[in-house]
Amino acid sequence: MIYQMQMPEKIDVDEGTHNDKNGIFIAQPLERGYGVTLGNAMRRVLLASLPGTAITGIKIDGVFHEFSAIDGVREDVPDIILNLKKVRFRSSTKRSCKTTVTVDGPADVTAGDIVAQEGEFEVLNTDLHIATVNEGSRLSMDVYIGRGRGYVPAEDNRGDGMPLGFIAIDSIFTPIKNVKFSVENTRVGQRTDYEKMILDVETDGSVSPDDSISLAGKIINEHVSLFANFSPTDEEFTEEEYKQQDDEFENMRKMLLTRIEDLDLSVRSHNCLRLAEIDTLGDLVSRKEDELLTYKNFGKKSLTELKEQLEKFELKFGMDITKYQMKG
């Protein structure tokens, strides 16, 4: 039997400060110590684990490295990158995409000039300054946009198959601008040693404060449920079961070594994979769908064809194959 603990019946909302970007949420009453426990967990998950959309890289015409100056543009490349990191998006898709920005001077380039080609995203801070183009000059650049969680450094955005001149940049995917919490004493009956946890959330507008704390709570719950459902077992594997596991492991390893040219694929898909240096099934399943769609000439038709092939092997994209020690 678990000792009955004092818990909140619901989360209260401070309606006076509540809007699309800001929210103050109050959980009470809590047992002593649980204000900090819950506040810390929610704050960490909100800042680091919620998905969002950000720019992952750029390619500027006539520029081949990130420390260049651009003829006819007041800002140099590092300044432009710093400005692009601040662009905030609301996205309607989970896949990566690319759009082209071309501006002739004299002009002030803003985040509003980054326009989705197929409605994949919406720029929220359209007035954000990106660059200044002088009269008679032009700024033309490809902007690569992706989905992710938290903060991702530039080196992790350098994927295979990117064009010459591609410059990866740090991505701030988190839609949360700021989170803080405080803990105060509160009364239940005659006792005054219970706690009230006040959570103050500010988002960039791509997600509401209500949805953000709901998602953070679900992420925490998914992890904690592993402990709640834990049941130790004394089950032991027989020698035959161990042998079966070894055989399954070896069969999977051999399957992942299957050469791409041995698959029944179209010439277009074969060529796309060859250019991306994807030689085996193992190379293919370790890639994510979003990554494949960034490769040159690789579209949804090729992706559907590859999915059908993987289903025949009972495989899928985004698999972790490190334990199979793939070689050659």
UniProtKB/Swiss-Prot annotation:
UniProt keywords, alphabetically: DNA-directed RNA polymerase, Nucleotidyltransferase, Transcription, Transferase
The protein's name in its UniProt record: DNA-directed RNA polymerase subunit alpha
Sequence segments annotated as region (Alpha C-terminal domain (alpha-CTD)): 252-328
Pfam families, per the entry: RNA_pol_A_bac, RNA_pol_A_CTD, RNA_pol_L
Record's keyword annotation contains Metal-binding: no
Subunit structure: Homodimer. The RNAP catalytic core consists of 2 alpha, 1 beta, 1 beta' and 1 omega subunit. When a sigma factor is associated with the core the holoenzyme is formed, which can initiate transcription.
Region (Alpha N-terminal domain (alpha-NTD)): 1-231
Function: DNA-dependent RNA polymerase catalyzes the transcription of DNA into RNA using the four ribonucleoside triphosphates as substrates.
Reaction(s) catalysed by this chain's protein: RNA(n) + a ribonucleoside 5'-triphosphate = RNA(n+1) + diphosphate
HAMAP family, per database record: RNApol_bact_RpoA (MF_00059)
TM segment ranges: none
EC number in record: 2.7.7.6
Domain notes: The N-terminal domain is essential for RNAP assembly and basal transcription, whereas the C-terminal domain is involved in interaction with transcriptional regulators and with upstream promoter elements.
CC terms in the record's Gene Ontology section: cytoplasm; DNA-directed RNA polymerase complex
Gene3D superfamilies: 5' to 3' exonuclease, C-terminal subdomain, DNA-directed RNA polymerase, insert domain, RNA polymerase, RBP11-like subunit
Organism of provenance: Chlorobium phaeobacteroides (strain BS1)
GO molecular function: DNA binding; DNA-directed RNA polymerase activity; protein dimerization activity
Similarity remark: Belongs to the RNA polymerase alpha chain family.
Biological process terms in GO annotation: DNA-templated transcription
Keyword Nucleotidyltransferase in record: yes
InterPro entries: DNA-dir_RNA_pol_insert, DNA-dir_RNA_pol_RpoA/D/Rpb3, DNA-dir_RpoA, RBP11-like, RNAP_asu_C, RNApol_insert_sf
